[in-house]
Amino acid sequence: MNRTWLVIDSHNLCHRAWHSLPKLSWKGRPTEVIFGFLNSVDVLRRHFVTDDIVFCFEDSRSSFRKKLFADYKSKRHTPNPDPVEVQSREMLYQQIVGLRERHLPKAGFKNVLQYRGMESDDIMAVISRSLAYTKDDVILVTSDSDLYQCLAPNVMIYSLHDKKLKTEKWFKETHGIPPSRWAFVKAVGGCHTDCVPGIPGVGETTALKYARKELPKTTKAYQSIVAGKQIILRNRALVELPGGNCPIPELVPHRWPDQGWRKMLQSLGARTRMRA
């Protein structure tokens, strides 16, 4: 039986709920991230008509990338946060841990994944690599463009930014290179969101021109790229997916846990039940 695997960047989805929803609580415990996350999952599984959902959570606190490059993701947190921000982030963390360790497994979901030192996109990438060119379809749910490098005939990306499905064909037509070259482009142009500096004076647009062999050799940018091999090598280790030694999970096919889903929502004080 051919399956459609919905592989969710769960850390990303939790952060989106945290930024977009008002504060909610039940019996003194914060719940806005949990409810925003679960509502999105419910919408996604109905949209793609599949019960085979994989939740990928990251363990960035011990990321191997920080050991390779100390400034990796260094600007994502305020150096001296005020007490309100500290409390808000702690509430976010509590809800992420609650989803990963308690709510989702207890509801009956079998594929709830986290590996030491690995980010969500590492796990998503290793899953997509293991299932690429099989008869199953893989839909990566994320807003992280780094995962474009994983696109294949049966591996697609559903963007949380514009709610559109990105395919291998779309990528080739839009960028003029195969997905396998995307990590090189990111290594040359840098990744602002992850604080990975590229070749000085070279951005993504110029890096794409170089990758397509459209950048004249006489330009300063071309010469900078050629001279910046060490920067590119360092960055490849940071942006290439999957990174490190991410384990290949054994995914478990299963049906949507109707009863567990209802019980989970009731235990969280849901006034209106999301459909099971």
Regions found by a protein language model. Give the residues of each.
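Noncatalytic, basic helical substrate-engagement surface that gates or grips nucleic-acid strands
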Residues: 2-137, 147-165, 233-234, 240-256
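Short, motif-level signal for alpha-helix interfacial/capping segments enriched in acidic residues
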Residues: 121-130, 176-186
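Residues within well-ordered alpha-helical secondary structure of globular protein domains
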Residues: 130, 153, 212-213, 267
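Conserved SAM-binding loop
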Residues: 140
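Short, charged, surface-exposed secondary-structure boundary motifs
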Residues: 165-175
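Accessory alpha-helical DNA-binding modules that contact the DNA backbone or grooves
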Residues: 178-250, 270-274
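Long, highly charged low-complexity segments enriched in Glu/Asp and Lys/Arg with interspersed Ser/Thr
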Residues: 261-276
